[in-house]
Amino acid sequence: MTRWFNTAGPCNPAKHYTLSPTERLPQLERLIEQESYFVLHAPRQTGKTTAMLALAERLTQSGRYSAIMVSAEVGAPYQSDIERAELDILSAWQRAARSRLPADLQPPDFATVGPGTRLAGALSEWAETSARPLVVFIDEVDALKGDVLLSVLRQLRDGYPSRPESFPQSLALVGMRDVRDYKVAAG
């Protein structure tokens, strides 16, 4: 198959000309080993999603972690409807897990709890039932706005002290904005 330059989303090395995505960010594995939560921000079309998909696959294949790249973008239309945003985000995360993780590392069906705590509850349940430490990369988190963005950030902060047994060992917010910009964007 002839390869080509891709400018429309994640690259596939079998189809597209690309640099090794994981070699571009060697410090990330160290952050994960240190149970860090971190932000990866860069302009559009610079390889963030490609790199994080490749890193998640490599970490999972190593046998040491259950690592996945998920997206928060489906929650973007709901600036103040936390319940709807959470439900759509969790549905997208379940689909991503089904397509990217082996059956033995799939999350449980996310239990329904009250709005404002669904994401934390799902991540907690997933970490507690996972046979390996859970690593989650949340792409497009900066697509969220208003009350929804604040709710997501508060839930992640609330779960942080419970890692790695009851919350992801390591978590990355991936997008175009630095974390300092999130509160401003939330209003």
Q: Predicted segment positions?
A:
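Walker A/P-loop-proximal flanking segment of P-loop NTPase domains
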Residues: 1-46, 50-59, 121-126
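Alpha-helical scaffold elements adjacent to nucleotide-binding pockets in ATP/GTP-utilizing enzyme cores
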Residues: 50-55, 84-92, 151-155, 159
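Conserved Walker B catalytic segment
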Residues: 114-178, 185-186
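Active-site catalytic microenvironments for nucleophilic, acid-base chemistry
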Residues: 58, 96, 162
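The start of beta-strands in P-loop NTPase/AAA+ ATPase cores
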Residues: 36, 66, 134-135
